Amino acid sequence: GQDTAIVHLSANDGEAIENEIIYGSVSGLKSDEDGKALGGAVIGIFKTGTEEFTKENAIQTTTSADDGSFSFEKVPYGTWVIREIESPTGFVLSEEEIAVTVGKVDEVVEIELVNYFIKGNIELTKVDADYPDNKLTGAVFEVYADTNGNGEFDKDDKLCGEMTELEGGVYQMTELRYGKYFVREKTAPDGFVLDESVYGVSIEENGKTYTVENKAGVGFINDAQKGSLKIVKTSSDGKVEGFSFRVTSADGYDQTFKTDKNGEIFIEGLRIGEYPVSEVSDSASAGYILPADKQATVKTDSTTIVEMHNEFRDTPKTGDDFNLGLWVSLAAASVIGAGVLGFVGFKKKKKED
């Protein structure tokens, strides 16, 4: 066969040759959707192909500073993935995966990571306190941000705007950022009492709608504005007790009341509005001419007075009818008697002649 030639090479003065790993670095800036620096984000650098982005699986981890800056030092040669592990409070975890490649010694790769605010919605349903199935429209609600975060409504809190009224007495404000808010009723629906209290609500989960109530399990209730009605009864013969009066309204109110010994009826807690008042035709009012119906306007926190007068019917009594007949009979008898006596006297005188 052929002989193989052996060549001896000598390099580096006979010392072993070592390959040094190339290292670079990654630096970045963390900001929110408004472009403001964002600290407190935990960020990791991972091997490509990683499926679970946890601290345990990361090659390195770091936390963004208050000025939003972060960096990874001594990143080995190759391609890596940068991914957020924990978001700052109030922000949605970023699932963006940014690939970075270190290809030469001391190379610095710069990146930017953005976090978006947690945003939620607030909603309330306006309800009639007396009739919960009756949903109220026409209210105006203001929403304030708890700017100083003290949990108390004060002059420093910022007005975010007014809630939008949807159909069916539902009011809503959407896309509110993470934090605490206050809801205050600015204008009550017509005929209802304004709720002057302020109600707090916190946005904590992204995409969630939070319900504001002033009565748990019912909704945001309003009491109706109310007043009183007084009916005063008079009559030509002085009788006033026990007469019945009917009071109605367009919203379904329909009640009948009787006058007391003073001829009065006092009704409290009537919703403001128009109430027709009519006297009931019954045994108590049978001998009287009933008065015309009257319209009573009930106003907030006041008493409306309605006066109703009865005239007694002027009809002859049974005893008077008897006496009149008796007198007529007696008068007729007298006339007849006088005629008979005159006739007898006339005949007697003629006979004497």
Regions from the language model: what does each represent?
Residues 1-353:
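Solvent-exposed loop/turn and edge beta-strand elements of beta-rich ligand-binding domains
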